[in-house]
């Protein structure tokens, strides 16, 4: 099974630990992570316009992202065979 979280910072945040860089948008990030975890397919994520779902390119080819706010995004990969996200990370996208 692929690792769930790509970086330690995101894993700590999800486990309830305070992550200084994420405090300004913590509530929004938790909400988006809940939506991501509950999605039965990536098409379900596309159906919510507020997610601003997109397939990424360049050095992030094969990854997808949903929006937390104008600066931060949740990037992840999706397994088609079992329909779940993995290598999830919260990134400063700009």
Residue ranges and their predicted role:
Residues 1-33:
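Arg/Lys-rich, positively charged N-terminal/basic patches that mediate binding to nucleic acids
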Residues 2-4, 12, 43, 61-68, ...:
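Alpha-helical interaction segments
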Residues 16, 39-42:
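Short hydrophobic alpha-helical module
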Residues 22, 41, 48, 87-88:
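Short linear functional motifs in flexible/disordered or boundary regions
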Residues 36:
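Conserved phosphate-interacting/catalytic interface
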Residues 41-64:
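A short, surface-exposed loop/turn module that caps and links secondary-structure elements
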Residues 57, 64-94:
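Enriched for short, Lys/Arg-rich terminal
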């Amino acid at each position: 099974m692929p690792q769930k979280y790509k970086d330690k910072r995101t894993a700590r945040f999800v486990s309830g630990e305070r992550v200084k860089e994420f405090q300004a948008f913590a509530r929004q990030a938790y909400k988006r992570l809940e939506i991501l975890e509950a999605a039965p397919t990536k098409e379900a994520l596309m159906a919510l316009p507020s997610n601003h779902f997109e397939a990424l390119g360049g050095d992030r080819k094969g990854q997808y992202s949903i929006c937390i706010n104008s600066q931060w995004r949740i990037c992840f990969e999706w397994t088609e065979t079992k329909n779940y996200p993995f290598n999830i990370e919260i990134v400063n996208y700009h």
